[in-house]
Amino acid sequence: MATKEQNLKRLDELALILGREPDISGSAAEIAQRVAEWEEEMQSSGDDVQVMNMDIRERETAAHDVREETSGALTRIRVLTCLHLCGVDGETGESVELADVGRVILIMSSDAKTHVDGGMAVYA
């Protein structure tokens, strides 16, 4: 039997596939039930889901390729103000467009210098 955290992760995956916002509130049993319902719905929708799965995998692969190509040019910063930027989360590796105060982000070195010089971030 999956843990609550595993079911939450699966719920996020299914939300991407089905194009929905996941409801992550509730007990472990409620979340497990939600996962079971969404998996059943995904299986019944058939071909459309396979196409969406391929699209999601292609996007994830492209994001990974971009990270690999630019990894040498990325600099780690800690955000001091809420920023709209194009970067990678320093902990999860997910792409980030909006960074909250205190979040550690990997961004292009030139952008990092601009944010640090402007007092909006510090090097982490």
From Swiss-Prot:
Family designation: To phage lambda packaging protein FI.
InterPro entries: Packaging_FI
Record's protein name: Uncharacterized 13.5 kDa protein in GP7-GP8 intergenic region
Biological classification of the source: Viruses, Duplodnaviria, Heunggongvirae, Uroviricota, Caudoviricetes
